[in-house]
């Protein structure tokens, strides 16, 4: 069966139609927020009991209040359920992700001499408690467990936990449990969706209250994070998957088709565009996509064909390559792959993207699993202001200052004038003769 891949000719679109291409499926959260509000309130009031009820209602799982936390026996069982080769691949991925994030770690403290005797710097300490949210709705995602848990451990977070929806059997995905153990997290809880976010925001008898939650999720999860942002830090905005493959006229259309399908297969709420100024490449890629659908599971074909036939996906054909670049920067994609014989020539032109992958040997799928950089990336245009998940999401910095007497005498006169100009007498007094007198009086007492 041949599926339609929509070609959007940018020059033929009105401003309204162009803006529609830039919108994401989760842009309007109003309906989700109305659904999520009572769920949050129920968890706040009833804790574990509410989590057990929602496991049955939403996950079709029987999870009693004393089964919310994964047991050691469940961890042990997970290793018997996952193929040894898969465990080796999980370990391989963890090693690569760990190396990247270890290289990303800043010095614990640095100080610079600003003026003679004036020293200032930063000191980094880990956030006390962070929850890693691992989605499950459209499959199992041990890769997300790796991407969220590894930097937590590298950063030294004292309380790092995983929350994830249970399957219909009341158990957590086995590969996710294997990852948790390999990484060094032994606290995993069976609570997903908005109820999981509420649980770590308020804490329950079983689930610890956390300072921050990281990880992607459904619009229900995104809505819950938005509503609870004053109580728990919601982390990098990470909604449904999205990608752009930017291809010039030197690119291989079959590779463009292969890589376009990577993010499109995540679900019907994904967004995926091939953006090019080459009509020939666009048409050849359109044919190739239908060929590659023959090698995919029916469910993934349904997901990706839905995406590529609507306004959230397909092929964007521009008049010039510069126009293609402009569209990419306006879109600010989660993933952006540049296909060109000279990808580095185009790298500097891209200013808005969660990640930029270069060339035909760097497919999005490798970046998602084994390359090293974090694959939890800003979505919904957040890449215009936000960054990929990193060790810095698990750290907080505190400014450090120290003055010698020489440094104090250097800065005090300027500080005094500043304070008097702004009308702060106590500020001015603290750097006036009153300070010198206070120091002298202390010496006399001693």
Curated annotation (Swiss-Prot):
In which residues is Zn(2+) bound? Answer: 266, 427
Q: Which InterPro entries match?
A: Ald_DH/histidinol_DH (IPR016161), Histidinol_DH_CS (IPR001692), Histidinol_DH_monofunct (IPR022695), Hstdl_DH (IPR012131)
Give start-end of the signal peptide.
Answer: none
Recorded family membership: Belongs to the histidinol dehydrogenase family.
Q: Tell me which GO cellular component terms the UniProt record holds.
A: cytosol
GO molecular function list = histidinol dehydrogenase activity; metal ion binding; NAD binding
Q: What is this protein called?
A: Histidinol dehydrogenase homolog
Task: Recite the UniProt cofactor note for this protein.
Answer: Binds 1 zinc ion per subunit.
Look up the record and name the cofactor or cofactors this protein needs: Zn(2+)
> How would you classify this enzyme at the top EC level?
oxidoreductase
Gene Ontology biological-process annotations: L-histidine biosynthetic process
Keywords, A to Z, come to:
Metal-binding, Oxidoreductase, Zinc
Which SUPFAM superfamilies does this UniProt record tie to the protein? ALDH-like
Keyword Chaperone carried by entry: no
Pfam assignment, any one: Histidinol_dh
Cell cycle as a keyword of this entry, yes or no, is no
Where are the catalytic residues?
334 (proton acceptor), 335 (proton acceptor)
Give EC number(s), comma-separated. 1.1.-.-
Can you tell which superkingdom this protein's organism belongs to?
Answer: Bacteria
């Amino acid at each position: 069966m041949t599926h339609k891949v929509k070609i959007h000719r940018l020059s033929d679109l009105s401003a309204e139609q162009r803006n529609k291409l830039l919108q994401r499926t989760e842009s309007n959260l109003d309906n989700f927020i109305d659904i999520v509000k009572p769920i949050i309130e129920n968890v706040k009031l009833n804790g574990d009991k509410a989590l057990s009820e929602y496991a049955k209602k939403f996950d079709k799982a029987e999870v009693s209040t004393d089964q919310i936390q994964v047991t050691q026996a469940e961890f042990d069982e997970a290793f018997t359920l996952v193929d040894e080769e898969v465990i080796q691949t999980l370990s391989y991925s963890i090693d690569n992700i760990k190396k990247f994030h270890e290289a990303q770690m800043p010095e614990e403290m640095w100080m610079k001499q600003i003026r003679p005797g004036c020293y200032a710097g930063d000191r980094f300490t880990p956030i006390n408690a962070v929850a890693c949210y691992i989605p499950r709705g459209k499959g199992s995602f041990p890769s997300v467990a790796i991407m969220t848990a590894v930097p937590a451990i590298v950063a030294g977070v004292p309380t790092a936990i995983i929350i994830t929806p249970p399957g219909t059997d009341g158990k957590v995905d086995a590969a996710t449990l294997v990852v948790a153990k390999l990484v060094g997290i032994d606290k995993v809880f069976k609570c997903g969706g908005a109820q999981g976010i509420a649980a770590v925001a308020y804490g329950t008898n079983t689930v610890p209250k956390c300072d921050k939650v990281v990880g992607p999720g459904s619009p229900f999860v995104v809505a819950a994070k938005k509503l609870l942002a004053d109580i728990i830090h919601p982390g990098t905005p990470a909604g449904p998957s999205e990608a752009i493959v930017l291809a010039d006229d030197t690119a291989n259309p079959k590779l463009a088709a292969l890589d376009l399908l990577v993010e499109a297969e995540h679900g019907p709420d994904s967004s995926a565009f091939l953006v090019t100024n080459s009509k020939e490449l666009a048409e050849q890629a359109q044919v190739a996509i239908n060929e590659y659908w023959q090698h995919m599971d029916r469910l993934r074909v349904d997901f990706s064909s839905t995406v590529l036939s609507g306004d959230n996906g397909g092929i964007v054909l521009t008049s010039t390559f510069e126009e293609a670049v402009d569209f990419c920067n306006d879109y600010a994609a989660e993933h952006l792959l540049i296909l060109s014989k000279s990808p580095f020539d185009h790298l500097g032109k891209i200013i808005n993207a969660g990640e930029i992958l270069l060339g035909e040997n760097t497919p999005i799928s490798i970046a998602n699993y084994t390359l090293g950089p974090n694959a939890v990336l800003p979505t919904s245009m957040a890449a215009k202001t936000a960054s990929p998940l990193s060790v810095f999401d698990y750290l907080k910095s505190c400014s450090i200052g120290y003055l010698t007497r020489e440094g104090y005498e250097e800065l005090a006169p300027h500080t005094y004038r500043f304070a008097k100009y702004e009308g702060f007498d106590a500020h001015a007094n603290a750097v006036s003769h009153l300070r010198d007198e206070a120091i002298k009086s202390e010496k006399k007492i001693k």
